[in-house]
Amino acid sequence: MDGGHGAADGEGVTDHARAVIVGGGVIGASVAYHLARLGWSDVQLLERRSLTCGTTWHAAGLVGRLRGSRTASRLVQYSAELYARLPEETGQATGWRRSGSLVVARTPERLIQLRRSVALGRAVGIDAHVIGAADVSRHWPLCRTDDLVGAMVIPDDGRVIPADVTQALAAGARAGGVRIRENVAVTAARVRDGAVTGVHTTEGAIACDVVVNCAGMWARALAQANGVTVPLWPVEHFYAVTRPIAGVTPDLSVLRDLDGCVYVREEVGGLLFGGFEPAAKPWMVEPIPEDFAFSLLKEDVEQFEVLMRGALERIPALESAEIQLLLNGPESFTPDGNFVLGEAPGLHGYFVAAGFNSGGIAGAGGAGRALAEWIVNGAATMDLTAYDPRRFLPRHAEPGFLAARMREAPGLHYATAWPNRESETGRGLLRSPLHERLAARGACFGSKMGWERVDWLAPRGVEPRTAYAFGRQNWFAHAAAEHRAARERAALFDQTSFGKLLLEGPDAGALLGRLAANDVAVSVGRTVYTPFLNERGGYESDLTVSRVGAESWFLVTGSAQRLRDADWIRRHITGGIRVALTDVTEAWATLGLMGPRARDVLARVSRAALDHDAFPFGAVRDIDVAGVGVRAIRLSYVGELGWELYVPSPRAGEVWDALVAGGDVTPAGYYALDSLRIEKGYRAWGRELTPDDTPLEAGLGFTVKLDKPEFVGRAALLAQRVRGVRRRLLLFALDDPEAVAWGDETIYRDGRVVGTLTSAGHGHTLGRPVAMGYVSCPPGAPPETLVRERYDIDVAGVRIAAAASLRAWHDPAGARMRA
């Protein structure tokens, strides 16, 4: 069927294209340019009004290279390089100016954040350094400095004229054969059998294989027409421009005072200043008017006051300056502050590039190239999981949730980047059936994929609220007690947020054999831990596969991978494959009973045979627990004897109560789970395992069976095995027991940068900080030689010596969990 959007295929079609891009802002122009560069000339870009008319035209044009992650920084690095060369290539100016950036710190905590950013910059090749407060005036003579503790300088940052960048990209796209049509609106994609076949427009239907939704503020509504989730919402966004001010020169760098919520740059001899208020103002309009083009919103002096105050505190000369413009232009933001980039789940050929959180100019070049490569190659060529549309549930796009979250999300761009920071708005989308019980026990909850999850539990008399810090946070001792309970006695984790899928049918085994790198052709009652790989040999997911029937498999994956894994499987159900895939996540609660006494605790409330011979490691059994039918899998993510108990959600409370009734079980949260798994060297999706990492690099070659029939990624791994890996995951233990690392710290080997930490925590069993991270190595070098080198970890500007290992620090032989 055609998805309910008009005529059948071929009927009413007035044009054809290989790809149609919807939206003529800087993002759409970048995608068009890069598709043309990759040889796709049969492309149309459709703009409902005129190029740049949505939000691009009023953007401030800042291009700051150093972002919050390695991937984001690399994307913007490319943008800066592109904008610098486009004028020569296309003959169209971009306004690129290498102005540099100066980021000032009012507090010691902010200075720690800047030092962490400098370390990240070194790892990705961005020049950045910290200066003292006394040196700030040399970079910015008009800047007040008496309340500063330091600053960060990024010499290669820059600025552009957004409309000019868009026109340059459009010129390059046209030169490559792209057809750009203005005053043509797209109303929906044409769909047949789960794939794009064209688009409906105000000028008729166009047949195409690919549609790219770059519709900016309108992207959510356009996506909804085809059942696609794009959770973004427009927010009123402000900046002011002054008339010329004495002492303001064109060579001033862009000044950012994150503690004051503002940025400042030169503008025709005056200053342009704006920022991100801690309490933003969503533009509460639905739908967004179709005729909103080159338009602005009403001035709101009261909302702008916090930015005005921050600017005055930093630039006293503004007190006597004349404001000639106060601009209020909407910008679209997403719930987690990352843009939406990639192919939509469940609809082949429907791509999205939207929700750039006021960073569209900086991100457009890199994002446009990354998405174009995805479209042309059929898969992403780099790790884009932080931006993948599959990270959101449909409920994340509901107006009530978005309106609440958008009051908070924009301000987090300039808020202190605390480790483990949790959003406070739009919470409670999904709750475990054990939520109230855990809340009564003092649980402090975090959020993952919409689920409320226990981070840590506060003892009686302690407020269950995290006090953020770059050092040890207030939960450290409480999570340590939970950690020790799992190592010494028994701990009980609520892991209900795990994604749970049921795959059934005559061809289920063959399909899994094609997708899984491990051998999943096991007998009924066995569980296998396996990667799902892409064609590059990188991780698409890691999960457990339990055979629960002759034609039935129970798949358990991480909380964030629920939609991702289901979509990955469905994409491979082709050619009459006889299977049924069902998401049963919310039907089952998950209890993780872990620790050396776990068998005794479970035996007290179950009649099942639990000894090692009857219930070995890796087995799955349907047993009774307190009279409730439970699916038990003997696995451990903490490195101790344990079971994952899958309980029908309505009866989860009965099982929980029975397990804790004896008083010998300690409820525990995810902070303890994380320190336990790092101490044991267990890799985590999104940290050690990403689409850019292979099992051979991750030290998980034992989870891959290269001698089994063909599976996705096998050829890439065979080739890598021959040529040798160029990077390898190592486990680290820091020498300083008081050091606090959080991940993303830079790794030095013999004084040279060789990688960054992927995970870090405190090994309470070892009494030392522990971490993991990839380091570069010569191809074919024996891994054992890597651990004999000298390593240091840059923790907020201080290098701390660390021991390296290929094996787990705790129970490297794995005997305890197999007891």
List each language-model region with its residue ranges:
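Glycine-rich FAD pyrophosphate-binding loop
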Residues: 36-57
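Flavin-dependent oxidoreductases
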Residues: 30, 70, 188-299, 306-318, ...
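Beta1/beta-strand and adjacent pyrophosphate-binding region of the FAD-binding site
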Residues: 12-27, 44
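C-terminal catalytic lobe of FAD-dependent flavoproteins
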Residues: 162, 259, 268, 290, ...
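Dinucleotide-binding Rossmann-like beta1-alpha1 core, especially the glycine-rich loop
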Residues: 61-139, 259-264, 268-270, 291, ...
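Glycine/proline-enriched, intrinsically flexible loops and inter-domain linkers
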Residues: 382, 389-819
